[in-house]
Amino acid sequence: TDAMLEVLRADTSTDKRVWLIVSPGSPETVTLGAALETVFREGGWQPTSQKLTGMVLKPGPVRILVGEELEPPAVDTVRRALEAGGLTTETGTGYRAFYEERKRDNPNWAGIPMEAEQPFVVVISPRPVA
């Protein structure tokens, strides 16, 4: 966590909000979400955690879903901090348009919704079995 804190504290962004979407399906995921919330808060950020409902995530990396095509500056810091903590990450841009398109095509599609004030979300899935 020291390496993560170093990255987070060095960031000079004015907007230090981060949204953690936690899959409640496994105790390990819930524990990781709580630990990340603590590290972000100690690093001077404003984390908000939400439990994912309506779907079960497959095991995989920590995913950063960016609403627009261009990443806000905070995304790079968040990604570097997660990687400094030994986590594998994937980043996807243009998620808001993708979500809306999928919902239009299939109203029953279970995706991860983004609120208007969320430029990005960090999705914490169960870790793959090694």
Outline where the language-model segments fall.
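Long, folded non-catalytic interaction modules
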Residues: 1-130
